[in-house]
């Protein structure tokens, strides 16, 4: 192993910008679909040399349209896809007609579903004194479009805002129970996702975000904080116009600050003393298309931009590393993330 995993205390110092000798690593071994199939034991052997500074545990979420366990009601909505899904993900929504909204709310999954934390509890023996992060995908925006469909959601912002607010409160109640479960098990943070941006800006106007999402975010973050935990948010795309709102809501760590979408120098200089960054190394171009030297230089560039002695920087991959990525580039990334030090 290149170095020992960082302690829980060191990670907390980095998140809270109170110093720390090393930059914590998380999601640096974010393997996309097909990567392990391609490289197999070679990738496993390589990855074993690089520590996970964060222990992450994922509860069993409700299924989309089909239950994720033996309880047929443990899913967000029912659709008969027994013959396969033959259309885009944006059309696999659970709530097609708002006339069914009351029924949908009555049939909401139970956050206290028996067994949904069994795997989390069993995995705790592997935490080894590290920072413990409770995880699930999809918070508000992502859950809204999964329930309504992306096109419907864009219309709902203007025609059905009242219903979205009711749905948001219902989701908030659900998430609070999940947060409670993680808190009872001694977790240090909550990681979740809302891809709020596309390549050139947010998926909704800042005004829509302020009216609909900001109150939900504030209450969610406040609740997590009340349990003594941090909030980590994964949000792809260009979130520049929403940064002030995310900071106002109290988000502690933002991932990935997507390369090509956000101006890293501006983000680091403007917001680096207000929020911490889990910067994600570019998986769209640098890792799959660059040379080993390109990968190393990119990591040097990122650290030199974001590093501060007081902390506030964590490092990983921007998203799932895909199988078109050369193994030598993955090795170079892991080496530099673990060994490179700020030099300016």
List where the protein language model places each region.
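Catalytic cores of TIM-barrel enzymes
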Residues: 1-344
């Amino acid at each position: 192993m290149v170095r020992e995993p960082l302690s829980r205390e060191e990670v907390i110092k980095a998140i809270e910008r109170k110093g720390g000798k090393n930059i914590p690593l998380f999601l640096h071994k974010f393997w996309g679909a097909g990567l392990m199939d391609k490289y197999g034991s070679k990738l496993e052997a390589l990855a074993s040399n690089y520590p996970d500074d964060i222990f992450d545990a994922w509860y069993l979420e409700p299924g989309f349209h089909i239950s994720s366990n033996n309880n047929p009601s443990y899913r967000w909505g029912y659709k008969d896809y027994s013959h396969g899904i033959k259309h885009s993900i944006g059309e696999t929504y659970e709530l097609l007609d708002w006339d069914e909204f009351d029924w949908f709310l009555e049939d909401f999954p139970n956050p206290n579903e028996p067994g949904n934390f069994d795997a989390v509890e069993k995995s705790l023996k592997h935490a080894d004194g590290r920072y413990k992060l409770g995880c699930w995908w999809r918070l508000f925006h992502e859950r809204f479009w999964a329930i309504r469909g992306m096109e419907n959601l864009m219309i709902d912002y203007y025609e059905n805002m009242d219903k979205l607010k009711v749905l948001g409160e219902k989701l908030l109640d659900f998430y609070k129970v999940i947060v409670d479960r993680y808190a009872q098990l001694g977790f240090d943070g909550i990681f979740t996702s809302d891809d709020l941006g596309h390549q050139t800006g947010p998926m909704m106007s800042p005004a829509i975000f302020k009216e609909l999402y900001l109150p939900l975010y504030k209450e969610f973050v406040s609740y997590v904080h009340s349990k003594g935990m941090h909030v980590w948010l994964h949000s792809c795309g260009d979130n520049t116009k929403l940064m002030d709102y995310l900071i106002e809501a109290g988000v502690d760590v933002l991932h990935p600050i997507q390369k090509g979408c956000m101006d890293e120098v501006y983000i680091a200089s403007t917001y680096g003393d207000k929020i911490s960054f889990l910067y994600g190394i570019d998986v769209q171009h640098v890792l799959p298309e660059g040379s080993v030297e390109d990968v190393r230089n990119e990591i040097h560039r990122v650290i030199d931009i974001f590093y501060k002695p007081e902390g506030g920087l964590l490092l990983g991959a921007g998203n799932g590393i895909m199988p078109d990525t050369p193994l030598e580039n993955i090795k170079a990334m892991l080496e530099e993330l673990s060994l490179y030090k700020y030099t300016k």
